[in-house]
C-alpha cells in the first residue's frame, strides 16, 4: 500500500534495495545495470525502479540528502514494502592521507554528530554498524572484481558546510575513512526495524588536499561501486 512518500504497492520492491542519494543516479543505475526495469516510485521526484540483475530481482531508489530524508525512505521501505536489505551507494570525502581519490570505502561502522540514534536509544550511544554478512560479501565481491576496497569507520555529518573544520583532525586521529551524511541514520533505522544495511562509498573529493574527481572519474569509480554492491547481493543469496 502506498505511503505518503512512496506510491508503490506491496511486491513492487525487491527484498534488496540499492539507494544512492540522487534519484537521477538511481535512474542511471537501473538503466545501466538492470534488465526488465520498471518505475515503481516518483513521489516528490524520488525515483525508484525495480528490475533484474543476472536474473535476480533488485530495486534501486534515491534517498535524498541527510539523515532525516534517508530515514523516512528506508523506514517505509522496510515496514511497508517488505524490504530486508538496504545498500547505500554514494560518495564521501576523505580526511586521511592514505585514503585517495576514487578509493572504494565499505562503511563497517558509522560515527555521527546527529542525535537521531540517541533519540532511538534512550539518549545512550548506539553502535551504528553494518550487517557483518553484507560487509563480508561486499569485500569478497570487490576482491573478485579486482577492486582494493577500504573497510572501516565512516562519519555521517549533519552539516555539509561545517562551522568547525577542526573536527576533521579528530576524525583523522580516530581513523575515519570518509565523511558522508546518511550511513549512521540508515544503520539505526535498520536496527530499529529488524532489517540489514550496508554503505559503500567512493571517495569523490579529499577534504584536506581539496582534490576533486572529474565527472568522468566519478562515473568510472561509481560503476565499480555499483558492481560490488550488485555482486554482493548474489553472494548473499548463496549463504
Curated annotation (Swiss-Prot):
Residues at the catalytic site: 205
Domain of life: Bacteria
This enzyme's EC code(s): 2.4.2.1
Sites where the protein binds a purine D-ribonucleoside: 5, 180-182, 204-205
InterPro entries: DeoD-type, Nucleoside_phosphorylase_CS, Nucleoside_phosphorylase_d, Nucleoside_phosphorylase_sf
MF term (GO), any: purine-nucleoside phosphorylase activity
BP-aspect Gene Ontology terms: purine nucleoside catabolic process
Residues that coordinate or bind phosphate: 21, 25, 44, 88-91
Record keywords, A-Z: Glycosyltransferase, Transferase
Coiled-coil positions: none
Keyword Transmembrane helix: no
Gene Ontology CC: cytosol
SUBUNIT field: Homohexamer; trimer of homodimers.
Family of this protein: Belongs to the PNP/UDP phosphorylase family.
Stated role: Catalyzes the reversible phosphorolytic breakdown of the N-glycosidic bond in the beta-(deoxy)ribonucleoside molecules, with the formation of the corresponding free purine bases and pentose-1-phosphate.
Annotated NCBIfam families: deoD (TIGR00107), PRK05819.1 (NF004489), PRK13374.1 (NF009914)
Protein name: Purine nucleoside phosphorylase DeoD-type
Organism: Klebsiella pneumoniae (strain 342)
Gene, per the UniProt record: deoD
Amino acid at each position: 500500500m502506498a505511503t505518503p512518500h512512496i506510491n508503490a504497492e506491496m511486491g513492487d520492491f525487491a527484498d534488496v534495495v540499492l539507494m544512492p542519494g540522487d534519484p537521477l543516479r538511481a535512474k542511471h543505475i537501473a538503466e545501466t545495470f538492470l534488465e526488465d526495469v520498471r518505475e515503481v516510485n516518483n513521489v516528490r521526484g524520488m525515483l525508484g525502479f525495480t528490475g533484474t540483475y543476472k536474473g535476480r530481482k533488485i530495486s534501486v531508489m534515491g534517498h535524498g540528502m541527510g539523515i532525516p530524508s534517508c530515514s523516512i525512505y528506508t523506514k517505509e521501505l522496510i515496514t511497508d514494502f517488505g524490504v530486508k536489505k538496504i545498500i547505500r551507494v554514494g560518495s564521501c570525502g576523505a580526511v586521511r592521507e592514505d585514503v585517495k581519490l576514487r578509493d572504494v570505502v565499505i562503511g563497517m561502522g558509522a560515527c555521527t554528530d546527529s542525535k537521531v540514534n540517541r533519540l532511538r536509544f534512550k539518549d545512550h550511544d548506539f553502535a551504528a554498524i553494518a550487517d557483518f554478512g553484507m560487509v563480508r560479501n561486499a569485500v569478497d565481491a570487490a576482491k573478485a572484481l579486482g577492486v582494493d576496497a577500504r573497510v572501516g569507520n565512516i562519519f555521517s555529518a549533519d552539516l555539509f558546510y561545517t562551522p568547525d573544520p577542526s573536527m576533521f583532525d579528530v576524525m583523522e586521529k580516530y581513523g575515519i575513512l570518509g565523511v558522508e551524511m546518511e550511513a549512521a541514520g540508515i544503520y539505526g533505522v535498520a536496527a530499529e526495524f529488524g532489517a540489514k544495511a550496508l554503505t559503500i562509498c567512493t571517495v569523490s573529493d579529499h577534504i584536506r588536499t581539496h582534490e576533486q574527481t572529474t565527472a568522468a572519474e566519478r562515473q568510472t569509480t561509481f560503476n565499480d561501486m555499483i558492481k560490488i554492491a550488485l555482486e554482493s547481493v548474489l553472494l548473499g543469496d548463496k549463504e
